[in-house]
Amino acid sequence: MIKKLPLLLFSLFTTTLLFAQQPTNTKNISLKGKVVEANSDAPLEYATIVLKNTVTQNISGGITNEKGFFDIKTPTGTYEISVEYISFKSIQLPTQKLTADKNFGIIKLSEDANSLNEVVIIAEKSTVDIRLDKRIYNVGKDMTVKGGNASDVLDNVPSVSVDVEGNVSLRGNENVRILIDGKPSALVGLSGADALRQLPADAIEKVEVITSPSARYDAEGTAGILNIVLRKGKALGFNGSVNSTVGTPDQFQLATNLNQRGKKTNLFSNFGYRYSKGPGNSFTDLRNFTNGVVTSSRIEDRIWQRRRNSFNANVGLEYFLTKKSNLTGTVFYRNTKSGNYSENTIEEFDENFNNTDNAIRIQDEDGDDETIQYSLNYTNNFNKDGHKLTVDFQYSDSKENEEAINTEPGFTDETNITNEASTNTLVQADYVLPIGENTQFEAGYRGDFQNLTSDFIVTPVSDPDFDPSNNLEFGQNIHAFYTQYGNKLKQFSFLLGLRLETTDVKVRLLGTNENNDFSYTELFPTVNIGFEATEKQSYTLGYSRRLRRPRFWYLNPFESRNSQNIIFKGNPALIPTFTNSFDLGYLNRIGKLTLNASVYYQHSTNNISRVTRQEIREINGNDESVLIREPINLASEDRYGFEFTSNYNASKKVRFDGSFNLFNSRTEGIYTYNFLDPDTNETTVITDDLGNSNTSWRARFNARVTLPYAIEWQTRLSYRGPNESAQNVTKGIFSANLAFSKEVLKEKGTLVLNVSDVFNSRKRNSLNYTPNRDNPTNISDQTFQWRQRQISLNFSYRFNQKKKEAQRGGRNDGDGGEGFEG
């Protein structure tokens, strides 16, 4: 049944549209007129005329052409008539009985200053909105992400970077919480980095970067929160867009956004199909040392081809119960079939670098990932402005199945089977009560309940002493209650909050009949203060207590292998990391230039870190060095830094923006483990000091220029600085993206040529030391490239939509910290 769901969703949507447009046998009349801008008498193309029959309650209407004229055929009857246009004040004409053709003449609309900053449309440039507890980056008309995915979008957001494996970091910290529409979501999937690559960029409206979250948000994510807000059609009538992308290496994508809105309902949808097949590679040179002398070495040269077929559908219906309340139901479905073929050429050498052994290890992997999510939202805006109640329910069911066959000449083929299934249930209620003109009280509850099973099977088992097969059950229930109070006193505003979270975790290892259950209850205070020095200058100060919960794969003690000599295993003794975060921000608008700077500091205890240790194991009849990578709780980490972003609109044809982040992290901690020497059969207790200080930086520059013949040119340059830890040194990475776009078909269509990673330089080069850099017994020199340079051509066509040539109301740079919205 679940495999037929995409067809059912599409049938439901198209059937609804057909019924909405069924003609009747009543006599039709013609209604004509012209809609213009009040100040200039300029015609308004795509203005919407809405007709509501007072007897049947049917909604009909039409839109104006490029000269502002409309000509609507409609049955005779009595109608409520309104004329609407985005960011303009709507006009409600008197209810009237229409029995014959009528010309309404010229209808003038005036701009609505209160709604200028609420326009949901693809604008010319990404803009910045600063509030007490978050910054909002509107995706806008960003050519470099056309035909891309959510990872591409996040990598273009200031303060955010995405590494070559798809891991997302905020201000250099990878422990960032990613939400979809303000809630944990199945769209992030069981494997977050991979799932983000399957979410089309065209489906994203904006990204909220929350470095000092208020009490309304989850306490999880020591770096902060990234909230991805999806597009939902808001314009009246039937409208939408179609996007198609082709590229090399093999890429094809087709996506549609369809919307049908009337007075009582809004039906919106996103459908997408994506196929990709791309090469990648890695090279590893591993050397073993004794007293500083090389005793053996190993070279692994790996190439692969990743293949994906992905379909996603998101269909929602918003029903307006009253003018103040609405009910919205959404169904999301995604299915991805993937394949990964890799060849790993292995060469082994002795202490004199004489070749002692060669092998080729081939892995052929197929996967099937399926997710369905149901969401229901009720919103009631009471009569008093800002008085609001929202209730949410969300349920998701995800399944991931993978089968990998490992082949090596001279040995029996090995099959790895992974079956994972997860259900998530979320219940949430938020209540906002204004008290007077500048005061606000808020309270709410969130329940987040996750159940997961993971079954990993290896056949046959070559070494019974190290059988990696395992079956794990994981359950995590979180109950959260919060309250917050906000006030504005002249130029000052503040938002004080307190959140209580109770977490119950149950881990079952079915193969060994082991249980690992634990519970904890913690308080998380938040403070956000704003000061509006002038109309163009503002300051913010934020404090929040955060945590990082260990994920189920970090708690699973059974082993999984990246290769024969590199093994990852979880640690069931992990406990959460707790972080105190402070953030001081400054915003200044100087003519065409906008500057946003901040200084931040974070102190973490029981910091979760991945470490590497060495074991000697028998592999194919030989004693070989094996690297075991596992997570542990280090003592503490202090992280502080400075960042700034800037926008400069030199003219309508030339725009620049950039960001820079400089940070330092200091880690303290001791790692103790047992080392068994197979020659003497003696166990030695090894103690490694993993204390370290690392200074690094990130920089991004973006330029957009309008060339002759109305061709848009955009270039994005980014640099991810080098990083160091007690066991790793990673070199800096420079990359560049380039795009050209041209409006066609009377600006209803857009062609975009995009070159991602122009210089094919997006590679990770790292040195890994075991046990540490001061006294290594192993040094691994690795180069890794997830995907190569990509060239794509995207075409998008909009119907019943207006392409905005310039964002009305100027830059939406912020409210100076006046808002209380969390």
Task: List each language-model region with its residue ranges.
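Short, acidic Ser/Thr/Gly-rich low-complexity loop/linker segments typical of extracellular
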Residues: 53-69
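N-terminal periplasmic accessory domains that precede
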Residues: 105-108, 150-151, 192-194, 209, ...
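Face-selective signature of the C-terminal outer-membrane beta-barrel domain
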Residues: 312-336, 361-510, 532, 593-599, ...
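Outer membrane beta-barrel strand-and-loop segments of large Gram-negative receptors
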Residues: 424-428, 468-480, 571, 575, ...
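Surface-exposed extracellular loop regions of Gram-negative outer-membrane beta-barrel proteins
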Residues: 399, 504-506, 531, 535-581, ...
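Short acidic/polar hinge/loop motifs at secondary-structure boundaries
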Residues: 73, 150, 156, 183-211
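Transmembrane beta-barrel wall of Gram-negative outer-membrane proteins
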Residues: 30, 250-278, 293-341, 370-372, ...
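Short, acidic, small-residue-rich periplasmic hinge/interaction motif at the N-terminus
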Residues: 36, 40, 48-52, 84-88, ...
